[in-house]
Amino acid sequence: MSERNDRKVYVGKVVSDKMDKTITVLVETYKTHKLYGKRVKYSKKYKTHDENNSAKLGDIVKIQETRPLSATKRFRIVEIVEESVII
């Protein structure tokens, strides 16, 4: 059971929900440059499993690493942290 707790957990924004049971999540992180000490922003997109198609474009979601679900999917949704407001 402790293995499940060691899996990576990220918080990111849904940038695509066009696929069935799959969303694309953009995760932004900061790293410090070794020589200059400046914080540099990095971003990466993850394909994420969404069983109920509950996440929508613009939502902030928490995702967790899981077993490979397809050729590109390695994450699943844990919770929707904040729902987007469509104007």
Swiss-Prot record:
Quaternary structure note: Part of the 30S ribosomal subunit.
Function text: One of the primary rRNA binding proteins, it binds specifically to the 5'-end of 16S ribosomal RNA.
Similarity comment: Belongs to the universal ribosomal protein uS17 family.
PROSITE patterns registered for this protein in UniProt: RIBOSOMAL_S17 (PS00056)
Any Pfam family hit: Ribosomal_S17
Keywords recorded for this protein, A-Z: Ribonucleoprotein, Ribosomal protein, RNA-binding, rRNA-binding
One Gene Ontology cellular component annotation held by this UniProt entry: cytosolic small ribosomal subunit
InterPro entries on file: NA-bd_OB-fold, Ribosomal_uS17, Ribosomal_uS17_bact/chlr, Ribosomal_uS17_CS
GO biological process: translation
Gene: rpsQ
Gene3D superfamilies (UniProt xref): Nucleic acid-binding proteins
Taxonomic lineage of the native organism: Bacteria, Bacillati, Bacillota, Bacilli, Bacillales
GO molecular function: rRNA binding; structural constituent of ribosome
Domain of life: Bacteria
Protein name from the UniProt record: Small ribosomal subunit protein uS17
Bilayer-spanning residue ranges: none
